[in-house]
A protein has these predicted regions:
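N-terminal leader/linker segments that precede catalytic domains of diphosphate-processing enzymes
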Residues: 1-116, 120-138, 142-166, 171-175, ...
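NUDIX/MutT-family hydrolases
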Residues: 180-214, 219-230
Length: 261
């Protein structure tokens, strides 16, 4: 593994360590790249919720189908896939939808120092919504009473932690005071969806490793998504969840799960 490299994204520095694959190819442009800049600005929370309903992703519509990647991971011999959930918490700040993110502690075993959505492993027989709300309360001090769960995004696989992750979208009332859990979360912050939709924010690479990854294409390549934000980098599973959220919010065809197929 290499350290943070300015040359990976020229002119952009970030504190995380991003692993080096055996082979890298350029990926596709952002699904929303063809949209006018005006269509990527002034996205409020109500618009995101409305789009979720239109795409059949409301809570009432039920869980979306499993991705081919997740099904492939579940078929791996001798591998136990751990069910998990994350909360895609949406705040409204001056009329703009923001998503709540965390920086994980550098002392953690998996995904140390990375930007993440609050969430974690399922406890007992609780469902994905209960898991996401509990984990957000434990990790960042978000009171479940201040969250209105409104929809689902596609469940995805985290190969690094052998997890099946169910993203739950929820709207947050007001401007909460965050309480990061020591030892798990270094800081809590939010990013405007409009900033993630900016022309220079998104990058896709296609990676190939010597050991085939479940869900890779016929040549062994799989997409890795990155969002460049000021002095930071969002990538991996979190970026994949955000790609689908932004695709739905902007009304474009295709989402993270479809791009994996």
């Amino acid at each position: 593994m290499s350290g943070a490299r300015a040359e990976r994204f020229p002119g952009h520095r970030y504190p995380q360590v991003v692993p080096e694959p055996d082979e890298v190819r350029p990926g596709a442009p952002a699904p929303w790249a063809h949209l006018e800049a005006s269509a990527r600005r002034s996205i409020d929370v109500a618009r995101v919720v409305r789009r979720l309903v239109e795409r059949g992703r409301s809570l009432e519509a039920g869980l979306p189908p499993l991705s081919q990647e997740l099904l492939a991971l579940a078929r791996e011999p001798g591998l136990t896939v751990r069910p998990s959930a994350v909360l895609v918490a949406l705040l409204e700040v001056e009329g703009e939808a923001h998503v709540v993110l965390t920086r994980r502690s550098r002392a953690l075993r998996h995904h140390r120092g990375e930007i993440a959505l609050p969430g974690g492993r399922r406890d007992g027989d609780e469902d994905a919504v209960a898991t996401a709300l509990r984990e957000a309360n434990e990790e960042i001090g978000l009171d479940p009473a201040h969250v209105s769960p409104v929809g689902w995004l596609s469940p995805i696989a985290s190969v690094a932690s052998n997890s099946a992750i169910w993203p739950v979208v929820g709207t947050v009332a007001g401007q909460p005071r965050w309480r990061p859990q020591p030892g798990e979360v270094e800081r809590v912050f939010s990013v405007a969806l409009a900033d993630l939709l900016a022309d220079d924010a998104f990058v896709e690479e296609r990676w190939r490793r010597a050991t085939p990854r479940p869900g890779a294409d016929d040549e062994g390549f799989f997409p890795i998504y990155f969002f460049r934000v000021p002095e930071d980098l969002i990538w991996g599973a979190t970026a994949r969840v955000l790609v689908e959220l932004l695709s739905i919010a902007t009304g474009v065809d295709g989402d993270a799960s479809e791009r994996l197929r």
